[in-house]
Amino acid sequence: MSTNFQNIIGTQLGQGTITTGYTSFYKVPPDTRTYIKEFDICNTTAGAINVYVSFVPVAGTAGTSNAILYNASIPAYSTLQWCGAQIINASGTVQAKASAAGCTITITGGEAQ
């Protein structure tokens, strides 16, 4: 039986400030698959903020059909941590938006070619 193993090196894939419109925080390079291990969203404001995160396939649009978080409320001065095991294929993206300014996202995982 032939087995094709690939080295996957863990790394920070993306980080940034979430706005009120969907923004791409990570795009999978060509000829690559990406393993999303976790993402953290930190609310740095005095009020709750609702967030939306989608793992969007190539030529797709962020929304309910590919949501990982949808209208999830993050309390004031709190951090939401999502842990899982999701694979995104070449040219797919991780996109997020929020109901108001004041959140940052950090995405970690690994890439395999």
Briefly describe each language-model feature range:
Residues 1-34, 38, 97-113:
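C-terminal interaction-tip segments
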Residues 17-23, 73-80:
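Solvent-exposed, conformationally flexible loop/turn segments
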Residues 22-24, 38, 67-68, 80-82:
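Short structured motifs
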Residues 41-46, 99:
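Short solvent-exposed strand-capping/beta-turn motif centered on an Asx-Ser/Thr pair
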Residues 46-70:
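Short, surface-exposed beta-strand/strand-loop-strand elements in extracellular ectodomains
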Residues 75-91:
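Beta-sandwich interaction modules
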Residues 91-97:
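Short, surface-exposed ligand- or partner-binding patches at beta-edge/loop junctions that are enriched
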